[in-house]
């Protein structure tokens, strides 16, 4: 299942994200890169939870900044 998510994230990064413009994510690494690392390094459900939590935190009220995968 993680391989499917990795494929979908890479597809998003290459086919969709470039058309959204630069600098849309408040975090470093970007939310999609964070998710990609999570699905490569963590069990599926842990990675899914981390990814959802990260996306929920990426909003106009968040200050963003450096937030690496732990």
Curated annotation (Swiss-Prot):
Source organism, top-level taxon: Bacteria
Keyword Cell membrane attributed: yes
GO annotation, cellular component aspect: plasma membrane
Membrane topology: Peripheral membrane protein
Record keywords: Cell membrane, Membrane
Localization annotation: Cell membrane
Keyword Cell membrane (UniProt): yes
Primary subcellular site in the record, as a coarse category: membrane
Family from the record: Belongs to the UPF0161 family.
UniProt function note: Could be involved in insertion of integral membrane proteins into the membrane.
NCBIfam families xrefs: membrane protein insertion efficiency factor YidD (TIGR00278)
Protein name from the UniProt record: Putative membrane protein insertion efficiency factor
Organism: Finegoldia magna (strain ATCC 29328 / DSM 20472 / WAL 2508)
